[in-house]
């Protein structure tokens, strides 16, 4: 069976139009997704090492499997890697999270860097959050605790408590 060229061209054009101009808007966050997804949060500490930081922001990815990755707007001061952790449901619209990051120590001098040294390990920090998700699933509030540990894993100065507000990152 032979198809006229005009008919094939029309079919191809119709396909392209529906593909390009169809509903290309990203799907809304599915109902019941809970905390899973990408978030931007502001933290305010009342005590501890972070109490003096007034513009602390965190970016999170809460993975469906219960893991999370966090990075802050201060990860480069001093250089520290992102934090990694876990999260879980704790009731209707309530969640708990716990994540850990490494603390680094500044080199004593520039010569330490040129000799192959650099920012050496100087401990770790653990954040825990008690999160309450808004009814629409697009924002949250949280109570935050920070525990500081020295390089040997013993409690160190700087632990504190505060609050956070977060918003889901969306198109």
Regions found by a protein language model. Give the residues of each.
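N-terminal glycine/threonine-rich, aromatic-flanked beta-hairpin/loop signature
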Residues: 51-94, 101-105, 137-142, 146
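A short, polar/proline- and glycine-enriched secondary-structure boundary/capping micro-motif
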Residues: 79-85, 106-114, 151-158
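Tryptophan-anchored aromatic micro-motifs
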Residues: 32-51, 85
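Edge beta-strand at a domain terminus
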Residues: 146-171
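Bacterial N-terminal signal peptides
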Residues: 9-19
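Boundary at the C-terminal end of the N-terminal hydrophobic targeting segment
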Residues: 22, 26-30
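Acidic, glycine-rich flexible loop segments
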Residues: 103-137
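Bacterial N-terminal signal peptides that target proteins for export
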Residues: 1-10
């Amino acid at each position: 069976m032979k198809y006229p060229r005009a008919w094939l061209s029309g079919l191809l054009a119709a396909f392209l139009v529906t593909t390009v101009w169809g509903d290309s808007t990203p799907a809304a966050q599915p109902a019941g997704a809970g905390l899973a997804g990408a978030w931007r949060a502001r933290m305010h500490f009342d005590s501890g090492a972070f109490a003096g930081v007034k513009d602390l922001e965190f970016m999170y990815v809460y993975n469906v499997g219960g893991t999370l990755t966090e990075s802050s707007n201060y990860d480069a001061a001093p250089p520290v890697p992102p934090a990694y952790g876990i999260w879980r449901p704790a009731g209707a619209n309530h969640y708990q999270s716990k994540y850990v990051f490494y603390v680094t120590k500044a080199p004593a001098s520039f010569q330490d860097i040129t000799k192959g040294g650099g920012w050496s390990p100087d401990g770790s920090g653990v954040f825990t959050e008690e999160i309450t998700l808004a009814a629409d699933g697009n924002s949250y509030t949280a109570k935050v605790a920070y525990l500081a540990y020295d390089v040997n894993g013993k409690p160190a100065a700087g632990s504190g408590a505060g609050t956070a507000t977060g918003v889901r990152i969306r198109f």
